[in-house]
């Protein structure tokens, strides 16, 4: 059995304070609740409230994860944050999170890989723990998508939300944690999705939804099958698959290809919308208490770049 590094000690999440339903969007966009829910599976999403930002969401999620783990921030020796919406070019969100939770002075870095960001960051955290360069990592995925999306654009404004998720990872004894990772990117497909800097209203997020849908429906099952095959496990040994929450139709189409039972798929896009790098860790609080030791979790991310990544975690 391969050794595993990055045992989950605790998880936490934070959401934008404004609940925006499909009915709310009907008032400002040429759309309907039925049109949105049928095509995306989204019923509502969260937008930041006054005083909230990508940074405040990341800090709140991190604090909750540490509290859930029952460990102080000072016990962490590395903070890694996946985000594409830091409101400032520098300092990093991770630096601000570390200072806020009492982990100032330790390593801290942001990682940007769009909606695949958390899966990428998990591979970095796992590698740092496996190498011994870190013994306890605070791993965060946070995005304020409303800072880069034109919320009055019917094609994109209906899709995205704001949130953050965090997990405390311990090096552990090698029995539980990340076992394997897949990383990939193809810059030739960069024109399929772009966005300007947060707050830059002149360059709001654009995506070729049709082509990205095709890419995701192909890549999602390919990564799941590949990471299972090279580690010699079957779907029966997988308790959960947590995909990036881009669109319920993508998840459903990929699940049909894999012939995955519905109960193995973790879905929150209906409640939170597409929260980019936050979407995978936002799922952890919903499943943490029922995790079965010895089973596996597969996380799958895909996003602009185009980027893709998968992680195999042994519970």
Swiss-Prot record:
It is found in: Cytoplasm. InterPro entries: ACP_syn_III_C, ACP_syn_III_N, FabH, Thiolase-like. GO terms for biological process: fatty acid biosynthetic process; secondary metabolite biosynthetic process. Keywords: Acyltransferase, Cytoplasm, Fatty acid biosynthesis, Fatty acid metabolism, Lipid biosynthesis, Lipid metabolism, Multifunctional enzyme, Transferase. It comes from the Bacteria. It catalyses: malonyl-[ACP] + acetyl-CoA + H(+) = 3-oxobutanoyl-[ACP] + CO2 + CoA. Residues 245-249 are annotated as: ACP-binding. Pathway: Lipid metabolism; fatty acid biosynthesis. One of its GO terms (molecular function) is 3-oxoacyl-[acyl-carrier-protein] synthase activity. It holds the Pfam family ACP_syn_III_C. Its main location: cytoplasm. Belongs to the thiolase-like superfamily. FabH family. PANTHER family: 3-OXOACYL-[ACYL-CARRIER-PROTEIN] SYNTHASE 3 (PTHR34069), BETA-KETOACYL-[ACYL-CARRIER-PROTEIN] SYNTHASE III (PTHR34069:SF2). Homodimer. Catalyzes the condensation reaction of fatty acid synthesis by the addition to an acyl acceptor of two carbons from malonyl-ACP. Catalyzes the first condensation reaction which initiates fatty acid synthesis and may therefore play a role in governing the total rate of fatty acid production. Possesses both acetoacetyl-ACP synthase and acetyl transacylase activities. Its substrate specificity determines the biosynthesis of branched-chain and/or straight-chain of fatty acids. This is Beta-ketoacyl-[acyl-carrier-protein] synthase III. It comes from Rubrobacter xylanophilus (strain DSM 9941 / JCM 11954 / NBRC 16129 / PRD-1). The gene is fabH.
């Amino acid at each position: 059995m391969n050794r595993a590094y990055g045992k989950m000690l605790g998880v936490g999440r934070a959401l934008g304070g404004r609940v925006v339903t499909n009915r709310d969007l009907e008032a400002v966009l040429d759309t309907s609740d039925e049109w949105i829910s049928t095509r995306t599976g989204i019923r509502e999403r969260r937008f930041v409230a006054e005083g909230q930002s990508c940074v405040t969401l990341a800090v709140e999620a991190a604090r909750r994860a540490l509290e859930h783990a029952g460990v102080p921030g000072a016990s962490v020796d590395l903070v890694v944050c996946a985000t594409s919406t830091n409101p400032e070019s520098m300092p990093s969100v991770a630096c601000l999170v570390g200072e806020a939770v009492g982990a100032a002075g330790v390593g801290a870095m942001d990682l940007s890989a769009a909606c695949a960001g958390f899966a990428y960051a998990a591979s970095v955290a796992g590698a740092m723990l496996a190498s011994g360069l870190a013994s306890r990592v605070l791993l965060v995925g946070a995005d304020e998508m409303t800072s880069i999306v034109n919320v009055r654009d019917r094609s994109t404004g209906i899709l995205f939300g704001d949130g953050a998720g965090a997990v405390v990872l311990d090096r552990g004894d090698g029995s539980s944690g990340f076992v394997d990772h897949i990383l990939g990117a193809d810059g030739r497909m960069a024109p399929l999705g772009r966005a300007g800097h947060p707050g830059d209203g002149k360059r709001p997020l654009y995506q070729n939804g049709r082509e990205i849908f095709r890419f995701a429906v192909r890549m999602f099952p390919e990564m799941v099958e590949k990471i299972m095959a090279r580690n010699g496990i079957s779907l029966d040994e997988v308790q959960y698959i947590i995909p990036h929450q881009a669109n319920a139709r993508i998840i459903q189409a990929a699940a049909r290809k894999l012939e995955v039972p519905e109960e193995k798929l973790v879905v929150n896009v209906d409640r939170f919308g597409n929260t980019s790098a936050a979407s995978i860790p936002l799922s952890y609080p919903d499943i943490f208490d029922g995790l079965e030791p010895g089973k596996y979790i597969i996380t799958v991310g895909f996003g602009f770049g185009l980027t893709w990544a998968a992680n195999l975690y042994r519970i």
